[in-house]
Swiss-Prot record:
The gene is foxc2-b. Residues 230-258, 352-379 have a biased composition (Polar residues). Residues 166-194, 221-258, 341-380 are annotated as: Disordered. It is found in: Nucleus. It comes from Xenopus laevis (African clawed frog). Residues 171-186 have a biased composition (Basic and acidic residues). This is Forkhead box protein C2-B. One of its GO terms (biological process) is positive regulation of DNA-templated transcription.
Amino acid sequence: MMQARYSVADPNALGVVPYLSEQNYYRAAGTYGSMATPMSVYPAHEQYTPAMARSYGPYHHHQQAAPKDLVKPPYSYIALITMAIQNAPDKKITLNGIYQFIMDRFPFYRENKQGWQNSIRHNLSLNECFVKVPRDDKKPGKGSYWSLDPDSYNMFENGSFLRRRRRFKKKDASREKEDRLLKDQGKVQGPVPSLELPKHEKKIIIKSESPELPVITKVENLSPGGGSAMQDSPRSVASTPSVSTDSSIPEQHPASNGFSVDNIMTLRTSPHGDLSPVPAIPCRTAMVSSLPINYTAHTQSSVYSQACTQSMDTSGSFQCSMRAMSLYTGDRPSHMCAPSTLEEATSEHHNGTSSPLNSMSQESVLTSSHHQQTATGGQTAAPWYLNPGADIGHLSGHNFGSQQQTFPNVREMFNSHRLGIESSALSEHQVSGNTNCQIPYRSAPSIYRHSSPYAYDCTKY
């Protein structure tokens, strides 16, 4: 066996360990073989077969005789009773006749008679399709007859007892009878369909009128550009400025062509690539505020202070003094829309260069362009912005103040940088008579409350 297992001619050529392992292997096998030997004397089929044959032998022959008859038939108790009644000669049968018919036809019901016979009695008494007929005195016997209701013969589909249409009710049967009678009369008589014609015509009229109402409302609500419909309805008036901003706003306010909070916010949030002289005109006219701004001294001052305040509230890093912020700025690309905006701002005034607010409007334009420069993300001002004496002079028709042409001292720059926050506290009488934006800034009262006994006076410096 060692030679057959390892395919070696000489078993002595193997080592000690394989030899010992083989010896242990065969020794263990011999042990299990000796244990299995006495068990094989009495095999399993010899021990259990006679006992099983003796205990289950009498019932085995009966199961092979009729295995299919012991399966419950797929019919309900109502179907079984109906079969028994229909197979009777007079279409009526007693309760015992029903029992006998079921047991003769289906061997499954030969067992457990008490259970299914009780169910048969319940179905006879609870279903309206079964009618109890009293027994005639001429025929001897006990118990009444059971028959089917004449209207319940069609309760099974196509005569199959496996499927019933619905539970039979006498009320439903009487209604079906009436419907059948009406249909039969309608076929025979002619005026009955003529009476139904007005109802049919009314239905047609209702169907023709009903779709007109939603069509009319949809046309009125979704009118694209109607002149009278868009002006009369409140929804169209509310949506007119949002749909056509460039056309409706200049018609309503032909004289309002100045600056507003929306104008400064639009100039500040426009992208860097669009900062050219041409798109500055539709940008300002399209986003002008709905409230007109008349160019008087009081309204222009309040608008200017409101613009500064709005720029401060929306973004805390923007200040209104362009001279204070120009200290930290460097070079700037030269394609700016400020020169064209300055020319438009001065040309659109009512009195031209004779307006007392000419220099203030120029200051506001420069300030709005300054906000636009600082909002584009870390970019710096243009060279003409840093050197106003050399580069702004080429703009004809513009007069700049002496304080714009010269740099202030260091203290004034930081002072104006701080006073940019205080622009919301300016009143109309402080700004009305001034033509330069620096003077109302210096005379503005401080909005801070100092806890020290002395107050910080801005006008000293």
